[in-house]
UniProtKB/Swiss-Prot annotation:
ANK repeats lie at residues 90-119, 125-154, 158-187, 191-220, 224-254, 258-287, 291-320, 323-352, 365-394, 395-424, 426-459. Belongs to the ankyrin SOCS box (ASB) family. Interacts with MAPRE2; this interaction promotes MAPRE2 degradation. InterPro entries: Ankyrin_rpt, Ankyrin_rpt-contain_sf, Multifunctional_ANK_Repeat, SOCS_box, SOCS_box-like_dom_sf. SMART domains: ANK, SOCS, SOCS_box. Keywords: ANK repeat, Repeat. Pathway: Protein modification; protein ubiquitination. Residues 531-586 form the SOCS box domain. Coiled coil: none annotated. This is Ankyrin repeat and SOCS box protein 14. The keyword Repeat applies. The SOCS box domain mediates the interaction with the Elongin BC complex, an adapter module in different E3 ubiquitin-protein ligase complexes. It comes from Rattus norvegicus (Rat). May be a substrate-recognition component of a SCF-like ECS (Elongin-Cullin-SOCS-box protein) E3 ubiquitin-protein ligase complex which mediates the ubiquitination and subsequent proteasomal degradation of target proteins. Plays a role in the inhibition of cardiomyocyte nuclear proliferation by mediating the ubiquitination and degradation of MAPRE2.
Length: 596
């Protein structure tokens, strides 16, 4: 006896050592094993009887044909009641295993061998045997469990009920079975949704009919305030919506927690038939959500052209004004030129500016629809807006500045032809010269585009120091906290820009009369290859032809210079008109480059 006890103790110590080693491996090498600690404990501590029972159940799991030998083997284990109450690491009892196999006889044997308390016991995911049978769409198994009193309303840990699961599985017969055995059609599941919510969301008309005929509340609200009608509208399930409105008498005016109407949700889905149906039943297109957006804003932003077409006639301009944002802004922001064209043709004001309460959400304080289009680099939308009379100089950050920053030649040219101000000044750290120049120092095409359209070049040569020595300049003017009237000579003579000074100054001289350059700029220019040519221009009188061009341009003014209609009536030969407009220096018009 002592020897036997010693052997048993040694075996126990050995088993304990193995378990400790395995636990350490699991702790330090999680990537090498897919098992959880619970699985390991289950593998280690499950009794032999449990393993034999599960093996007998799973052998017939995938076959509905009777296997008497296996059934008899399982029946022979029925006397081991404790083993039928054991669960593995996932919380699965033999009854859970039996619920998801095809042979009902196996389920019956297992149920009878299990204690009644195990019939409602859940897995680690909160699933009862009935829930698992429903999830596996095993109608006979579910029916058998229901006949034995299993709860049809027991939810899993995610909050889903067997009935809702049947809806998700699109199992009409299963849903009918559950309802006939007491399933609550108005039971609140995950996110406070009912089975009708899910049926409507998925557009399953038969399920919706079944739920409504079984007493489901057509206006039950989810945790976000959505009704089944709203969820059906989101998915564009028009026929399902028709069912809810006709048979369920669902409330077409219901609103979600953020005040989003059913109509707005339908517009978000983009189905025009769903939108039209709701309007037929009295939905109001002028009810905003808490953000202030109307259904028409959502349609324009999403690019739902057909839905937008339906909404335009039924949306009040007064409601749009109260919202503080035009659908034109939304269409431009979403880069939907087709929607933009529809709205413009319908008479929406292209110069409607964002209200202050809307602008504050943008760091650049943008106001116009044109700014949205320019920011997107959307040429089609920009053309539509400018052709309809959009003003390009209404925003705190000039639209031209955005286009210059992008380096988009076509966009820049488009804005300049429609009156973009080349002489704008940035509000922060303004330079002594118009701000647009700083984006063109490395690009002659863009530089000449600005100069051709009347850029104030003379301010670049306006330096109060003249021939005197410049004082030592620090760089505090380049920070965000110090406002400084920085001269052109201070910018172009920076160490990282000096190599550009010769080319930039040479181009500028084509657009000015006789000018004097300061000592600081001259010292840098003298080191450039173009200095001899620049020196000749600076020290000699300009040609009469050139001076006449400058005088004509000054008399005409910048706005007339850009106007093709005005130029066509000017009593001058075409060659002279071209000369006045600097056509010989129009590198973009000559197609020398296309930009980015």
């Amino acid at each position: 006896m002592d020897q036997q006890s010693s052997d048993e103790d040694a075996d126990t110590d050995f088993d304990t050592q193995i378990i400790i080693q395995q636990s350490l491996l699991d702790a330090y090498k999680p990537e090498l094993t897919g098992r959880t600690p619970e699985d390991e404990r289950s593998q280690s501590f499950s009794s032999e009887d449990y393993k034999k029972i599960v093996e007998a159940i799973e052998t017939v799991k995938y076959s509905s044909y009777p296997r008497p030998s296996k059934e008899d083997a399982l029946a022979s284990f029925a006397k081991y009641h404790p083993a039928f109450d054991e669960a593995n690491g996932s919380g699965w009892l033999p009854l859970h295993k039996a619920a998801v196999q095809l042979n009902k006889n196996i389920l019956e044997i297992t149920l009878n061998a299990s204690k009644p308390s195990a019939w409602e016991q859940t897995t680690r995911n909160g699933e009862t045997p009935l829930f698992l049978a429903v999830s596996s769409s095993l109608l006979e198994n579910a029916h058998f469990l229901l006949l034995n009193g299993c709860d049809p309303n027991a939810k899993n840990f995610e909050g889903n009920s067997p009935l809702l699961t049947a809806v998700l599985k699109d199992s009409y017969d299963m849903a009918t079975l559950l309802i006939n055995h007491g399933a609550n059609v108005n039971l609140r599941c995950a996110n406070e949704r009912t089975a009708l919510h899910e049926a409507a969301k998925l557009g399953r008309q038969d399920m919706v009919k079944l739920m409504l005929s079984s007493g489901a509340n057509p206006d039950a609200r989810s945790s976000y305030g959505f009704t089944p009608l709203a969820l059906a509208a989101q998915g564009g399930h028009t026929e399902t919506m028709q069912l809810l409105l006709q048979k369920g008498r669902a409330d077409v005016h219901s609103q979600a927690s953020d005040s989003s109407s059913v109509l707005l949700e339908a517009v978000r889905g983009g189905d025009p038939d769903s939108v039209s149906l709701l309007l037929e039943y009295g939905a109001d297109a002028n009810i905003p959500k808490s953000s202030g957006h109307l259904p028409i804003h959502v349609a324009a932003d999403k690019g739902h052209f057909l839905a937008l077409k339906v909404l335009v006639p039924v949306t009040d301009i007064a409601a749009i004004k109260r919202s503080g944002i035009s659908p034109l802004h939304c269409a431009a922001a979403g880069a939907h030129p087709q929607c933009l064209d529809l709205l413009i043709r319908a008479g929406f004001d292209v110069n409607f500016m964002l209200d202050q309460r809307v602008r504050k959400h943008y760091d650049d304080q943008r106001k116009s629809a044109l700014y949205f289009a320019v920011s997107n680099g959307d040429l089609s939308s920009v053309k539509l807006l400018l052709s309809a009379g959009a003003l390009p100089n209404q925003d705190p950050v000039n639209c031209l500045q955005i286009a210059l920053r992008m380096g988009n030649y076509e966009l820049i040219n488009l804005l300049l032809r429609h009156g973009a101000n080349v002489n704008y000044f940035c509000r922060v750290n303004p330079l002594h010269f118009p701000s647009a120049l700083q984006y063109t120092l490395k690009d002659e095409v863009m530089l000449r585009m600005l100069l051709n359209y009347g850029y104030d070049t003379e301010r670049c040569f306006d330096c109060p120091h003249g021939e005197r020595v410049h004082r030592c300049c620090t760089f505090e003017g380049w920070t965000s906290t110090v406002i400084k009237d920085t001269m052109f000579c201070e910018v172009i003579t920076l160490s990282w820009l000096q190599h550009l000074s010769g080319k930039v100054v040479r181009v500028m001289l084509d657009y000015v009369d006789q000018v004097q350059i300061c000592s600081k700029l001259k010292a840098v220019l003298e080191k450039q290859k173009l200095w001899p040519e620049i020196h000749v221009i600076l020290t000699n009188p300009r040609s009469l032809q050139h001076l006449c061009r400058l005088k004509i341009r000054k008399c005409m003014g910048r706005l007339r210079l850009r106007c093709p209609v005005f130029m066509s009536f000017l009593p001058l030969p075409n060659l002279l008109k071209a000369y006045v407009l600097y056509k010989e220096y129009d590198l973009y018009g000559q197609g020398s480059s296309t930009g980015t």
